């Protein structure tokens, strides 16, 4: 999992990327391409 400052640009890299908030953190998850995974921090 990558840790990035801004997830907005990462979200546009694949059409199945989802922006999710969990426990006060923002994540990018992708069910079809598992390699697109990131956390904002």
UniProtKB/Swiss-Prot annotation:
<dbReference type="Pfam" id="PF00444">
    <property type="entry name" value="Ribosomal_L36"/>
</dbReference>
<keyword id="KW-0689">Ribosomal protein</keyword>
<comment type="similarity">
    <text>Belongs to the bacterial ribosomal protein bL36 family.</text>
</comment>
<dbReference type="GO" id="GO:1990904">
    <property type="term" value="C:ribonucleoprotein complex"/>
</dbReference>
<dbReference type="GO" id="GO:0005840">
    <property type="term" value="C:ribosome"/>
</dbReference>
<dbReference type="GO" id="GO:0003735">
    <property type="term" value="F:structural constituent of ribosome"/>
</dbReference>
<dbReference type="GO" id="GO:0006412">
    <property type="term" value="P:translation"/>
</dbReference>
<protein>
    <recommendedName>
        <fullName>Large ribosomal subunit protein bL36</fullName>
    </recommendedName>
</protein>
<dbReference type="InterPro" id="IPR000473">
    <property type="entry name" value="Ribosomal_bL36"/>
</dbReference>
<keyword id="KW-0687">Ribonucleoprotein</keyword>
<dbReference type="InterPro" id="IPR035977">
    <property type="entry name" value="Ribosomal_bL36_sp"/>
</dbReference>
<dbReference type="InterPro" id="IPR047621">
    <property type="entry name" value="Ribosomal_L36_bact"/>
</dbReference>
């Amino acid at each position: 999992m990558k840790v990035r400052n801004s997830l907005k640009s990462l979200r546009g890299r694949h059409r199945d990327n989802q922006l999710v908030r969990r426990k006060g953190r923002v994540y990018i998850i992708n069910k079809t391409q598992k390699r697109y995974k990131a956390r904002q921090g």
